[in-house]
Amino acid sequence: MAIKLIVGLANPGAEYAATRHNAGAWYIDLLAERLRAPLREEPKFFGYTSRITLEGEDVRLLVPTTFMNLSGKAVGAMASFYRIQPDEILVAHDELDLPPGVAKFKLGGGHGGHNGLKDIISKLGNNPNFHRLRVGIGHPGDKNKVVGFVLGKPPVSEQKLIDEAIDEAARCTELWFKEGLAKATSRLHTFKAQ
């Protein structure tokens, strides 16, 4: 299946723009910039959207303007309107279980406590079988500190690693369309920013 919708999860507003929880949106912003496809607000899809063409395939980009725990509202609206199936969707999100500087593709699975993923699974009819781009942000080491951690800004040294991983993920997304998921996954999964 070709990917028809790429989503970057985030919380809306300037106060959240630089927080770890918005790593998915950073990836979409970079992809839109690389492909010269500026995002614009589209209220009927509850988010910022753009359309790109990769290897002849029409692909929609989406950054929801809902809060993270309501991300499924935007994803569900766009998927329904364009008749996009779950396995044609790639969702980029921050990942506590990967260190900064690492990003990985994954198909399906649970939500791992991520409220954005949880809502998307629910709004896609409890179907978790969409692709994910997991952008490593690291873990605070104590589960009671997770909320403050994801809503905090990474130090400059970590931000640099996250940005490098996102840059590689954007390149590997283009590679996915050119040479397939296996090749893109192999390249991305051997990358670690230093």
Curated annotation (Swiss-Prot):
Entries under Pfam families matching the protein: Pept_tRNA_hydro (PF01195)
EC identifiers of the protein: 3.1.1.29
TM region(s), chain numbering: none
Site (Discriminates between blocked and unblocked aminoacyl-tRNA): 11
GO biological process, one term: protein quality control for misfolded or incompletely synthesized proteins
Enzyme class: hydrolase
Reaction(s) catalysed (UniProt annotation): an N-acyl-L-alpha-aminoacyl-tRNA + H2O = an N-acyl-L-amino acid + a tRNA + H(+)
Keyword Hydrolase: yes
Family membership: Belongs to the PTH family.
PANTHER family: PEPTIDYL-TRNA HYDROLASE (PTHR17224:SF1)
Known role: Hydrolyzes ribosome-free peptidyl-tRNAs (with 1 or more amino acids incorporated), which drop off the ribosome during protein synthesis, or as a result of ribosome stalling.
Official protein name in the record: Peptidyl-tRNA hydrolase
Originating organism: Salmonella paratyphi B (strain ATCC BAA-1250 / SPB7)
Phylogenetic placement of the source organism: Bacteria, Pseudomonadati, Pseudomonadota, Gammaproteobacteria, Enterobacterales
